[in-house]
From Swiss-Prot:
Pfam families: ABC_tran. Keywords: ATP-binding, Cell inner membrane, Cell membrane, Membrane, Nucleotide-binding, Repeat, Sugar transport, Translocase, Transport. It is a peripheral membrane protein. This is Xylose import ATP-binding protein XylG. It comes from Burkholderia ambifaria (strain ATCC BAA-244 / DSM 16087 / CCUG 44356 / LMG 19182 / AMMD). Belongs to the ABC transporter superfamily. Xylose importer (TC 3.A.1.2.4) family. PANTHER family: CARBOHYDRATE TRANSPORT ATP-BINDING PROTEIN MG119-RELATED, XYLOSE IMPORT ATP-BINDING PROTEIN XYLG. Its EC number is 7.5.2.10. It catalyses: D-xylose(out) + ATP + H2O = D-xylose(in) + ADP + phosphate + H(+). GO terms for molecular function: ABC-type D-xylose transporter activity; ATP binding; ATP hydrolysis activity. Disulfide bonds: none annotated.
Length: 519
């Protein structure tokens, strides 16, 4: 067996006396891919910040050995010089700069006199991408011209340009399509063959199974186990992550589906940059009380734009005829939708869901502050009581309600956004990618909440790129493709293949509106 490239022993990191890491061990060998698994808030990101130099030597206890010698890093530059490079979930690219300029950002090649040697950066960038078998990227184009999948590949090229010996991938496929994820996994396998080691952090355990040789599980800041992937099952990893077995991820129970509550007809959204192009083209559908309506389709199909238009949040021009309980609605802004009884948890939690500077509690009550106001003054005691009730109901884990929401894990941020929308007491709740970047324990809690709301008569619209999630939750499934409605299926024996087949099959024109008659 080869000698370890990296050894972390007994890593302890505390914040205000509270241990975020408590004696964590991690070993990585050359050419090995180690899966790092744990619930949100388990300490994965904190451990990687210790390793990558974000938390410099001296701010934590324990030992890190790199290539057999102690690693003493005062910052990220030191670890990158050693060959440790992290690719964060939120990509660190400058959209306006070219691909080549991004690949060499901070490591620019200069000519005598200090001018950048752009031609040489282009040549080397092309060679890097060629080496990765990536031929669909023009390195002279701005990064903004490429989608999330290509940008992830650009980040990998940027890391290899820094001569990475250990690549840390933090939720690398969270915004990728299935095809883009396959390309990513192929590249990870290729890097392993070249001797590059990887730490692969992901809640998608099928990806961990596909590329990882070893899995290290941490829970509540402590090391639980390190075992070869060949000896593990997905259920075993989940049990180690959450400390219990999750026997039924989708706890479906019979629930009554009532009359139509929301009807949307002829929804059309024009592209923000190119108004002649339609992102959503004449889509009509209805949802009933107590119904869980799944919305599936390929990435970029127009699902999010469709939901934004209904909620009054689409940034471009849109038209729609919306009726609530049979009455026409004029929705020009999210505030109109919330007043009418429609709430939405957005896809991009960080950009559209939370106010990072505010505390957890104030994020929860943000949409309903009027409820706690008397003569222009907020009743702080009543507000705090509501905050604590919602935090307890949704198991939002935070030391106190005034903790900045940005310091919480993704799963707890998502539950806080859900709490805010539930405080509005909606008749219709739109959930756009509700479990993206959320660990399996938090997923199970969100699924239980969805079924509980359906039993109470709330109409739920769940947009998801995870087809098992759609099939596990939905009573009925809409399929969107290239802005069109391409299928409306009752979820009775429905398969992933049927959904994908509908997504890839152009709709007959004109689109037939969905009937709103009662069953």
């Amino acid at each position: 067996m080869t000698e370890p490239l990296l050894t972390m022993r007994g890593i302890v990191k505390a914040f205000d006396g509270v241990k975020a890491l408590d004696g964590i061990d991690l070993t990585v060998r050359p050419g090995e891919c180690v899966g790092l698994c744990g619930e949100n808030g388990a300490g994965k990101s904190t451990l990687m910040k210790v390793l990558s130099g974000v938390y410099p030597h001296g701010t934590w206890d324990g030992e890190i050995r790199w290539e057999g010698a102690p690693l003493v890093a005062s910052g990220v530059r030191d670890t990158e010089r050693a060959g440790i490079v992290i690719i964060h979930q939120e990509l660190m690219l400058v959209p306006e700069l070219s691909v080549a300029e991004n690949i060499f950002l901070g490591n620019e090649i200069t000519l005598p006199g200090g001018r950048m040697h752009y031609a040489e950066m282009v040549r080397r960038s092309e060679a890097l991408l060629r080496d990765l078998r990536i031929d669909a990227i023009n390195v002279a184009q701005p990064v903004m011209n490429y989608g999330g999948g290509h940008q992830q590949l650009i980040e990998i090229a940027k890391a290899l340009n820094k001569r990475a010996k250990l690549l840390i991938l933090d939720e690398p496929s969270s915004s990728l399509s299935a095809a883009e994820t396959r390309i990513l996994l192929d590249i990870v396998r290729d890097l392993k063959r070249r001797g590059v080691a990887c730490v692969y952090i992901s809640h998608k355990l099928d990806e961990v199974d596909a590329v990882c040789d070893t899995v290290t599980v941490i829970r509540d800041g402590r090391h639980v186990a390190t075992e070869p992937m060949s000896t593990l099952t997905t259920d075993r990893i989940i049990a180690m992550m959450v400390g219990r077995e999750i026997r039924n991820l989708y706890p479906r129970e019979p629930h009554e589906i009532g009359d139509v509550v929301l009807e949307a007809r002829n929804v059309t959204c024009h592209d923000v940059a190119n108004p002649r192009r339609k992102r959503v083209d004449d889509v009509s559908f209805a949802v009933r009380r107590g119904e869980i309506l799944g919305v599936a389709g390929l990435v970029g199909a127009g699902r999010t734009e469709l939901m934004q238009a209904i909620f009054g949040a689409y940034p471009g021009a849109s038209t729609a005829s919306i009726r609530m309980n049979g009455r026409p609605l004029a929705i020009r802004a999210p505030a109109d939708a919330i007043r009418a009884g429609i709430a939405m948890v957005p896809e991009d939690r960080k950009r559209h869901g939370i106010v990072p500077q505010l505390g957890v509690g104030h994020n929860i009550t943000l949409s309903v502050l009027r409820r706690f106001a008397t003569r222009g003054r907020i009743d702080a005691a009543a507000e705090l009581d509501a905050i604590r009730t919602e935090m307890q109901r949704l198991s939002v884990r935070a030391a106190h309600p005034f903790l900045p929401i940005a310091s919480l894990s993704g799963g707890n941020q998502q539950k806080a956004v859900l709490a805010r929308m539930l405080l509005a007491d909606p008749q219709v709740l739109i959930l756009d990618e509700p479990t993206r970047g959320v660990d399996v324990g938090a997923k199970a809690e969100i699924y239980r909440l969805i079924f509980a709301l359906a039993k109470r008569g709330v109409a739920l619209i769940v947009v998801s790129s995870e087809l098992p999630e759609v099939l596990g939750l939905a009573d009925r499934v809409l399929v969107i493709g290239e802005g069109e409605l391409r299928g409306d299926f009752v979820n009775d024996g429905l398969t992933q293949e049927q959904i994908l087949g509908a997504a890839l099959t152009p709709a007959r024109r004109p689109a037939e509106p969905i009937a709103a008659s009662n069953p």
